C-alpha cells in the first residue's frame, strides 16, 4: 500500500515537472529557437547514425552544416528585437548576446568543412565528432545568454566537457592524451575556483542568483564594498582567466594546441574565446558594478602580461600550432582592451569587430595548416620552406592570413586593431595601447619570418616535405579550400569596406 502511494506521488510529481517544462517551452521557447534548431540537429544525427552505415557520411556533414546555417538565419530574423528575459530569469535575449551567438555559430559553420578530409584520413568516428562540435556550440550559445549564476556555470561546463573529448579524440596519439589530461585538470581547477567566487557573490547578495538581482541584493545588504566581494572578484577573474587563457593562465594552451587534432584546435581557438569574452563582459560589468576600478586594474595587468609574453614566446617556437597558441595569448590581450573600455567610447563595438576579423584570420590560417599537414604530415615551421614553388595558392593564402593577424594595412587585422586601439586611447588607456602597438610590431616579425620561408626558392633551403609535396586526390579537399578561401577573403576585403561593418556593430549595440 505504501509503495503504491509513493508510486502515485512520483507519477504526479513527474507529470507536474513535465507540464511545467512544456509550458516554458511553449510560451518562452521562441527566445531559444536557434538553440532548439541545434538540438533538433543533434537528435537527427543520432537517429541517422543508429539506422545507417558508414556510406551515409555526407549526410552527417550536411545535417550539421544545415542546422548551423538555419540557426544563424533564425538568429538574424530575430535581430534588433526588444530584450527578453525568459525561463524564470535564467536566460536573456538582447542584441549584445545575439552578436556573440552569431560569432560562435559562424565559427562552427566554418570549422566543419575543415574537418572533412582530416576525419577521413585519420579514420576518426564522424558522428561523435560532429555531436561534440554541435554540443559545444550549444553550450557556448547558452553561455552568451546566461543571466544567472547557475546557467553561467552549467553552460561553460557543457562546452568544456566537449572540448576535453575533442582534444583527446585521437586516442592513439600520446601528445593528444597528454593535452587532454592537462586541459581536463586545468579546466576542473578553474571551474572550482569560479564556483568559489560565485558562492561569495551568492552569500553577499543575500541569496540572489540573477545578475541584476545580485546588484540589488548587494545594495540592500550594504556588502558591495566588503572583503567578500574582493574575494569573489579575484576568484571569478582567475576562473574566467583559464577559459580566456591570458597570461599567466595560459599554461595549458600551447600543449593543447600542439597535441589536439588541428581542426579541433581551429574550433577551440575561436569559439572558446568568443564565449568566454561574452561571459566575462556580463559577469564583470553587472554584479561588480561597484568594483569597476578593481576589475579594470586586474584586466589591465592580464592584458599587459598577455601581449608581452604571448608575442615574445611566439618568436622562439618551431611548431606552427605552438606559435599560433602563443599568438592567441597575445591576441586575447588586445580583446581585453575592448572589455575594459566597455560601453563608453565604443569599446564593445571595437571588441566585437576585431573578434569578427580574428575569426576569419585565425580559421584561415588553420585551414592552411590542415591542408599542409595532410599533404606532408609535418607541423614544423622550417618544413614550410619553398611551399610557394609547389602550391602558390596555399602559400599566398597562408601569407595573407598571417599578415592580417600581424595587422598590416590594408588588411582587416590592421583596421580591427586600429579601431580597438583608438577606442582604448580615447578611454585613457595610454599604457595598454602603447604596449599593444609595440607588441603588434613584434608579432609582424615572426609572421614575416614564416612568409619568407614560404616564398624562398633556394633548393638548399627546401625540405624533403615540400619536395615530395603532392595535392590530395580526395574530393573533400574542396571543402577545406572553400572554407580557406572564404576566410582569406574575409581577412582582406573588410579592410577596404570597414565603415559599414563598424556602423552595423554600433547601431546594433546602441
Curated annotation (Swiss-Prot):
Keywords carried by this UniProt record: Chloroplast, Membrane, NAD, NADP, Plastid, Plastoquinone, Quinone, Thylakoid, Translocase, Transmembrane, Transmembrane helix, Transport
Subcellular location: Plastid, Chloroplast thylakoid membrane
Topology class, membrane: Multi-pass membrane protein
EC number(s) per entry: 7.1.1.-
Keyword Transmembrane among UniProt keywords: yes
Major place of residence: plastid
A GO cellular-component term linked to this record: chloroplast thylakoid membrane
MF GO annotations: NADH dehydrogenase (ubiquinone) activity; quinone binding
Catalysis performed (reactions): a plastoquinone + NADH + (n+1) H(+)(in) = a plastoquinol + NAD(+) + n H(+)(out); a plastoquinone + NADPH + (n+1) H(+)(in) = a plastoquinol + NADP(+) + n H(+)(out)
InterPro entries in the record: NADH-Q_OxRdtase_suN/2, ND/Mrp_TM, Ndh2_N
Entry keyword annotation includes Membrane: yes
Function according to Swiss-Prot or TrEMBL: NDH shuttles electrons from NAD(P)H:plastoquinone, via FMN and iron-sulfur (Fe-S) centers, to quinones in the photosynthetic chain and possibly in a chloroplast respiratory chain. The immediate electron acceptor for the enzyme in this species is believed to be plastoquinone. Couples the redox reaction to proton translocation, and thus conserves the redox energy in a proton gradient.
Name of protein: NAD(P)H-quinone oxidoreductase subunit 2 A, chloroplastic
Amino acid at each position: 500500500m505504501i509503495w503504491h502511494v509513493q508510486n502515485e506521488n512520483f507519477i504526479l510529481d513527474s507529470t507536474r515537472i513535465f507540464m511545467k517544462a512544456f509550458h516554458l517551452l511553449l510560451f518562452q521557447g521562441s527566445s531559444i529557437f536557434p538553440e532548439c534548431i541545434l538540438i533538433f540537429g543533434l537528435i537527427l544525427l543520432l537517429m541517422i547514425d543508429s539506422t545507417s552505415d558508414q556510406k551515409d557520411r555526407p549526410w552527417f556533414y550536411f545535417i550539421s552544416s544545415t542546422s548551423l546555417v538555419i540557426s544563424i538565419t533564425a538568429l538574424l530574423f530575430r535581430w534588433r528585437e526588444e530584450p527578453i528575459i525568459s525561463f524564470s530569469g535564467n536566460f536573456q535575449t538582447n542584441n549584445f548576446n545575439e552578436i556573440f551567438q552569431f560569432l560562435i555559430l559562424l565559427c562552427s559553420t566554418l570549422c566543419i568543412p575543415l574537418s572533412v578530409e582530416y576525419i577521413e584520413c585519420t579514420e576518426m568516428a564522424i558522428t561523435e565528432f560532429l555531436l561534440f562540435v554541435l554540443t559545444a556550440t550549444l553550450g557556448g550559445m547558452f553561455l552568451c545568454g546566461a543571466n544567472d549564476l547557475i546557467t553561467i556555470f552549467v553552460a561553460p561546463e557543457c562546452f568544456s566537457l566537449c572540448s576535453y573529448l575533442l582534444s583527446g579524440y585521437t586516442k592513439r596519439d600520446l601528445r593528444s592524451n597528454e593535452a587532454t589530461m592537462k586541459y581536463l585538470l586545468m579546466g576542473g581547477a578553474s571551474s572550482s575556483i569560479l564556483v568559489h567566487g560565485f558562492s561569495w557573490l551568492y552569500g553577499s547578495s543575500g541569496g540572489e542568483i540573477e545578475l541584476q538581482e545580485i546588484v540589488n541584493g548587494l545594495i540592500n545588504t550594504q556588502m558591495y564594498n566588503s572583503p567578500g566581494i574582493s574575494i569573489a572578484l579575484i576568484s571569478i577573474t582567475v576562473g574566467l582567466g583559464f577559459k580566456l587563457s591570458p597570461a599567466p593562465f595560459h599554461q595549458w594552451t600551447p600543449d593543447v594546441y600542439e597535441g589536439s587534432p588541428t581542426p579541433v584546435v581551429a574550433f577551440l581557438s575561436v569559439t572558446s574565446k568568443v564565449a568566454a569574452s561574452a561571459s566575462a563582459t556580463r559577469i564583470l560589468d553587472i554584479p561588480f558594478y561597484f568594483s569597476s576600478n578593481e576589475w579594470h586594474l586586474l584586466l589591465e595587468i592580464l592584458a599587459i602580461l598577455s601581449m608581452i609574453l604571448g608575442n615574445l614566446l611566439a618568436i622562439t617556437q618551431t611548431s606552427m600550432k605552438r606559435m599560433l597558441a602563443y599568438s592567441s595569448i597575445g591576441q586575447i590581450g588586445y580583446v581585453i582592451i575592448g572589455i575594459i573600455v566597455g560601453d563608453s567610447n565604443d569599446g564593445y563595438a571595437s571588441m566585437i569587430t576585431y573578434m569578427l576579423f580574428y575569426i576569419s584570420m585565425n580559421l584561415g590560417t588553420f585551414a592552411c595548416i590542415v591542408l599542409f599537414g595532410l599533404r606532408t604530415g609535418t607541423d614544423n615551421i622550417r618544413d614550410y620552406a619553398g611551399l610557394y614553388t609547389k602550391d602558390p595558392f596555399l602559400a599566398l593564402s597562408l601569407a595573407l592570413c598571417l599578415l592580417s593577424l600581424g595587422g598590416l594595412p590594408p588588411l582587416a587585422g590592421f583596421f580591427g586593431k586600429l579601431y580597438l586601439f583608438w577606442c582604448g586611447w580615447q578611454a585613457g588607456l595610454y599604457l595598454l595601447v602603447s604596449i599593444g602597438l609595440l607588441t603588434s610590431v613584434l608579432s609582424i616579425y615572426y609572421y614575416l619570418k614564416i612568409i619568407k620561408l614560404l616564398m624562398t626558392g633556394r633548393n638548399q633551403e627546401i625540405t624533403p616535405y615540400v619536395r615530395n609535396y603532392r595535392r590530395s586526390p580526395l574530393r573533400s579537399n574542396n571543402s577545406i579550400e572553400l572554407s580557406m578561401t572564404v576566410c582569406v577573403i574575409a581577412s582582406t576585403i573588410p579592410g577596404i569596406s570597414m565603415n559599414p561593418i563598424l556602423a552595423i556593430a554600433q547601431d546594433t549595440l546602441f
